[in-house]
């Protein structure tokens, strides 16, 4: 399953009305420069902060309101971009997948690399004028009713603590800690293995390594396609990017524990 989409393809489809481009970098960098027709979506928009501090996926009503406001429905292809050193774009892609969007992709290179390659970028004031012109276009020019996103939750790509407890000693399950070695050895879910999310990004602005490189890395760690994979990190952000890396490499049974260590720590089952 190809998670990424080619930058050259996007550059040639920037004005396509059936594509929604999402900038995951935050509003300040967005205002400075962004890809033409992109819309900003901060990480906080796709997170529900639980009482214990866990960063959980937003519920269906929230997702429907949010994604509809961005012009997303099931007929639109969604392309999310960000920076390779920031896993936020991965969490947004995973959130859309969890809520059942059928066609969401991660831009294959970072925004910095997009600029470096000479692809077009715009400033906020130019983009605002473009949006104004579109809003003033007559109905007969293709402007119809506003998009309506309908959540169709896919529970197979999400795990919670109770589910993990039933899988900790299952030889057919691999639990991946996508954090740093320091974090892993300080406190981790018993039985989990370390696979830092940064090991799955490229060295030249690629959001995800080549499939060949991913396969080699995963197999060396015993992360094989015949296993069910559960990813976690601190608050489920880096784990979401690791999920995309696994899907890109052709792994079918992959889940994200979005509660991650913040949620697990409340259950007093950590190895320290």
Could you tell me what each predicted segment is?
Residues 1-32, 86, 108-186, 197:
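Flexible, polar/low-complexity N-terminal or interdomain linker segments that lie immediately upstream
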Residues 10, 38, 96, 114, ...:
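Terminal peptide-recognition signature
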Residues 43-48, 110-111, 197-203, 258-262:
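Short, acidic/turn-prone active-site loops that include or flank metal/cofactor-
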Residues 48-77, 198-229:
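Helix-loop module immediately N-terminal to the HCX5R catalytic loop
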Residues 51-159, 238-260:
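Thiolate-centered catalytic microenvironments shared by cysteine-dependent enzyme domains
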Residues 233:
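Short cysteine clusters
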Residues 256-272:
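Cysteine-dependent PTP/DSP-like catalytic domain, specifically the C-terminal lobe
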């Amino acid at each position: 399953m190809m998670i990424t989409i080619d930058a050259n393809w996007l550059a040639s489809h920037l004005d396509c009305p059936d594509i929604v481009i999402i900038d995951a970098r935050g509003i300040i960098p967005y205002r400075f420069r962004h890809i033409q027709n992109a819309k900003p979506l901060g990480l906080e928009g796709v997170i529900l902060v639980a009482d214990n501090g866990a960063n959980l996926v937003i519920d269906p009503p929230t997702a429907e309101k949010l994604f509809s406001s961005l012009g997303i429905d099931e007929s639109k292809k969604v392309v999310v971009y960000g920076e390779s050193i920031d896993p936020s774009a991965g969490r947004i892609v995973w959130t859309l997948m969890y809520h059942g969007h059928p066609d969401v992709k991660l831009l294959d290179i970072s925004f910095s690399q997009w600029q470096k390659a000479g692809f077009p970028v715009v400033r906020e004031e130019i983009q605002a004028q473009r949006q104004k012109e579109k809003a003033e276009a007559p109905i007969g020019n293709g402007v119809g009713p506003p998009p309506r996103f309908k959540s169709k939750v896919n529970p197979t790509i999400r795990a919670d603590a109770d589910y993990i407890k039933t899988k900790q000693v299952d030889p057919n399950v691999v639990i991946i800690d996508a954090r740093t070695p320091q974090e892993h050895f300080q406190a981790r879910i018993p039985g989990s293995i370390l696979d830092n999310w940064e090991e799955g990004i490229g060295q030249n602005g690629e959001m995800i390594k080549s499939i060949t490189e991913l396969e080699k890395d995963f197999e060396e760690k015993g992360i094989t396609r015949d296993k069910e994979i559960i990813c976690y990190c601190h608050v489920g952000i880096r784990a979401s990017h690791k999920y995309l890396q696994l899907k890109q490499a052709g792994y079918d049974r992959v889940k994200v524990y979005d509660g991650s260590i913040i949620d697990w720590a409340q259950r007093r089952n950590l190895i320290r």
